[in-house]
Structures are given as structure tokens and as C-alpha cells.
């Protein structure tokens, strides 16, 4: 039986203590709903004095596509103006935006990874709240891919951008509320932060082991297994010549290209004996994104054991094999493509998008293979695991 869980938005008694009688601004998006499937925005507008909305990326109801310019618009249902806080000249609200606000509420579904934009957004929001002396209330949600497994590379302290920041691993194993506590405590942000915790969730639980229905945190993350794969397979977004399955019904589960020898790839992957996952060679034709309307030869990744599967090591192993098989066909995506947000200065300066995703160029330049890279970052992951413990809210 699914475990009964209450998200932060369901903890009305706790919200009343920090929101009643105050002018409230709301940061939210599609997929953020309460136990009765009512949008967070509508719950808050009905109960509190909501005066303003902040649009993160996809609109306050998930009604925009990624990259659409939405500096300001009116939400039809509430009549409230939504201001973009994720745009070219700033990330986070400006002083002008918060001058008539007493408290900001944040409730957005995230993906449990460093490179999912909402992680960077909540950190930037905390900085802005600290600078403008506006309290922030985070309505916590389940960590969708559990809170026990940490994976991947760890950002260097000098790196600051929307896909890598705060010495985080690729798979962070924190809820959004725990992450906010971690950043505030470890990096001295100074945000007046309140986290309304989840009730009933434990760290080893995946999202679909609870009674909370899965609503898309972004258009491509359509189920828990896709989200698990994304924690490593996001690396494929950094290779322009390989489709990661966008434009199909199985994003990240499918990887391929018109030139790929999929049968040989599957044979080589079987030799690697990667845990918790199996592969089938398949044909697919994306309707959009890379190789749109072209027949692709590829693989389908099928998770057989979530607790054993390590998508980060798996994804980079797949890339290793493809580079050996088709070195002339690997084309890395330029670092500037797809970015609509001005970023803080980032050191080291990368020219390939995959390097920003991985927080290093050691893999794309061939200095390290998948296993070497994974092993190299093991000590940094262990340090992170120890650091984050004091900010965890759940056992």
C-alpha cells in the first residue's frame, strides 16, 4: 500500500503561523498541488492575502514552454500579475518587485539533481530575500528519487551557474526544503528561512511509493524511472549529435541517432555488467528536438532495481562506448546554446555544455573515462554526505 504523505502545502496549521495577516508573494509552477489536486496557487489565494506572483521558468501554472519570454503577465484565474524572476538581467526578484511584500512562499516540484534549474532558482531566491530582507517560506515536497543515494561529480567551489553550484553532487539526495537549509547554513546566505516539512515521508522512499500523485515537474520527466535516469542521462543533453529521447514518449529512456550501431552498443553494455539496469536495441523517431522526424537507431534503458541502478555511471559508460564505436560522429553541444539566463561568472570557463553539466571537462576531453571520473569524485561525495546530515529533516 502507498504510504500516506502530506506535502508542505497540506500543513495548513503550520502555514497559518507564518502567512496569516501578511502580504504574500508566491513562486510556483505546474505540478505543485495539494492532496486534493488543487494547485498551490489556488490554495494560497483562497486562504491568504496573496498580492503578487513570481514566474520561475514554465509559468505559475506550467503554462509556458522552456525559454519563452515571460517578463510579466496576468494569471487569468486569479487576476494577479506574475513577474519573471528567471530572465536575462536577473535571477530572483528585484527590490522593486518585493517592496509591497511581507513574505515569499516557494512551492515547486523539483527533480533531485544539481542541474535541474529549480535548484539554482531557490538558491538565487534565497540570496534575493536576504538582500531585500524579505522572509522566505519553502513548502517542502518529497525528494522524487529518494534521499539516500548520492551520485556523480561534485561542483568545485569556484563554479556558479544554473546547472552547477554550491559544491553539490549530480544527484543531491535532499528535498527542496533540506537543500534550502543546506545552502543557508553552509554558505551563510542569511535568508530568514522557514521550511514547512513533509509529513510521513522517509529518505529511502521513491515518489511512487507514497500516495502523492505524480504530476510533471517538467514536460520531459513523465514518471519516477525517467526522473531516476535523468540524474545521469542529462549528460546526453550535452551531445548535439545524440538524441536523449526528447520528442518521444520515453525521454531519457531512449538514446540514439541515425548513425548509431545500436546492436553493437547493447552487446558492449552487457559486457560491462552495469547494476540495476538492462538495455534493448530499438528504433524511434523523435517528433521534435534532436534528429526530429528522422529514424534513429538506439537503446532503451530499463531499470530493474532502483536501489542498485546508478544512472550517472551508466550514462557516461554509454557515452564511452559510443565514442569508441563512432568517434567521428560525436559532436558536443556548444555551451551557449539554449541559455536564456544571464549567469554569474563561472570558473573554470567551459566551452562545452556537457562540461557544465558534469562540472568538469575531464570526461569530454578524454582525460578520464566513466569509471575513472566516478571514482575520482568519490571522496568529495563522501564529504558532501557528511555535510548535509545536519540539514536533513527526515530519517
Description of each model-found segment:
Residues 110-122:
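Glycine/threonine-rich flexible loop motifs
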Residues 201-291:
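Glycine-rich, aromatic-lined ligand/substrate-binding cores of catalytic
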Residues 159-232:
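Conserved anion/nucleotide-ligand pocket segment
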Amino acid at each position: 500500500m502507498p504510504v500516506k504523505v502530506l506535502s508542505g502545502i497540506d500543513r495548513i496549521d503550520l502555514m497559518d503561523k507564518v502567512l496569516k495577516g501578511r502580504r504574500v508573494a508566491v513562486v510556483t509552477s505546474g505540478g505543485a498541488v495539494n492532496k486534493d489536486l488543487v494547485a498551490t496557487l489556488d490554495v494560497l489565494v483562497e486562504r491568504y492575502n496573496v498580492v503578487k506572483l513570481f514566474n520561475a521558468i514554465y509559468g505559475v501554472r506550467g503554462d509556458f514552454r522552456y525559454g519563452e519570454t515571460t517578463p510579466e503577465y496576468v494569471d487569468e484565474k486569479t487576476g494577479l500579475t506574475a513577474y519573471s524572476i528567471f530572465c536575462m538581467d536577473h535571477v530572483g526578484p528585484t527590490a522593486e518587485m518585493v517592496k509591497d511584500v511581507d513574505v515569499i512562499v516557494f512551492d515547486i516540484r523539483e527533480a533531485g539533481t544539481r542541474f535541474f534549474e529549480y535548484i539554482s532558482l531557490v538558491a538565487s531566491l534565497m540570496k534575493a530575500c536576504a538582500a531585500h530582507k524579505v522572509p522566505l517560506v519553502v513548502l517542502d515536497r518529497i525528494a522524487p528519487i529518494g534521499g539516500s543515494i548520492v551520485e556523480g561529480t561534485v561542483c568545485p567551489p569556484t563554479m556558479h551557474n544554473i546547472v552547477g553550484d554550491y559544491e553539490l553532487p549530480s544527484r543531491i539526495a535532499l528535498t527542496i526544503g533540506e537543500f534550502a537549509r543546506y545552502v543557508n547554513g553552509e554558505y551563510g546566505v542569511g535568508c530568514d528561512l522557514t521550511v514547512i516539512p513533509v509529513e510521513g515521508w522517509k529518505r529511502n522512499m521513491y515518489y511512487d511509493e507514497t500516495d502523492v500523485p505524480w504530476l510533471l515537474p517538467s514536460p520531459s520527466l513523465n514518471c519516477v524511472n525517467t526522473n531516476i535516469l535523468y540524474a545521469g542521462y542529462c549528460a546526453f543533453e550535452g551531445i548535439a549529435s545524440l538524441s536523449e529521447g526528447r520528442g518521444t514518449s520515453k525521454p531519457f529512456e531512449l538514446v540514439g541517432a541515425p548513425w548509431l550501431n545500436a546492436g553493437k552498443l547493447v552487446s558492449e553494455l552487457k559486457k560491462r555488467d552495469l547494476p540495476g539496469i538492462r538495455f534493448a536495441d530499438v528504433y524511434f523517431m523523435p517528433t521534435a528536438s534532436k534528429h526530429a522526424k528522422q529514424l534513429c537507431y538506439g537503446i532503451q534503458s530499463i531499470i530493474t532495481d532502483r536501489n542498485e541502478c546508478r544512472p550517472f555511471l551508466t550514462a557516461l559508460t554509454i557515452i564511452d562506448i559510443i565514442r569508441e564505436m563512432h568517434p567521428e560522429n560525436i559532436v558536443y553541444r556548444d555551451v551557449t546554446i539554449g541559455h536564456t539566463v544571464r549567469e554569474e561568472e563561472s570558473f573554470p570557463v567551459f566551452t562545452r555544455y556537457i562540461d557544465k553539466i558534469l562540472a568538469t571537462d575531464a570526461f569530454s576531453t578524454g582525460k578520464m573515462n566513466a569509471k575513472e571520473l566516478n571514482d575520482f569524485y568519490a571522496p568529495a561525495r563522501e564529504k558532501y554526505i557528511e555535510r548535509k546530515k545536519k540539514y536533513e529533516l527526515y530519517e
